[in-house]
């Protein structure tokens, strides 16, 4: 979802499925799928082995993780691995900021109406370069919008970042969660080995 120039991932914990949430999920998924359609169309003039019409009917083994666009580029020899395809979206001007994903406030409110807790996923991915005061300022703004928790423990989070975020959550009474972001087999190769369920280092006593 979109928030002040950032593209955030917000999780819903303990919610009751509702038509509103289903509609938001469907809308977001359609935009994600369209990103790959647009990428193949943009790359096709440079790579004759790519066929936009063929791609629209393309199917892949979901057990391998990733998504159709990554698999198609890999099978066609454009990339050497599934993860090699990920930077291409931004390179061709087709990253998340180019699409009208829902606003963070809209997602947070919908999760709350579904009696769930909105949790910010992997904050270091967006805010890792900020000074502590600026980071806590953003956390406070999101809390004012209704955020109820933060994914504190994550593969890219340093011990310092995780401890700082956990401290903020404890002071605010927010959920403290942990996640590996395991997306299947494609994330278990190259430099992605740490993205495995159960491999994450954390402080269990702080989870809440």
Predicted regions and their residues:
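Extended, intrinsically disordered, low-complexity segments
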Residues: 197-208
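Conserved beta-strand positions in the central sheet of alpha/beta enzyme cores
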Residues: 119-120, 151
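A metal-dependent hydrolase metal-coordination microenvironment
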Residues: 1-65, 145, 150-199
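Short, small-residue-enriched loops and turns at beta-alpha junctions
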Residues: 125-130, 156-158
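Surface-exposed amphipathic alpha-helices with a cationic face
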Residues: 44, 105-115, 119, 166-170
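Hydrophobic, aromatic-enriched interface-forming segments
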Residues: 45-108
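Charged helix-capping and loop-helix junction motifs
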Residues: 131-140, 167
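Non-catalytic positions within long, well-ordered alpha-helices that form the structural scaffold/packing
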Residues: 112, 140-143
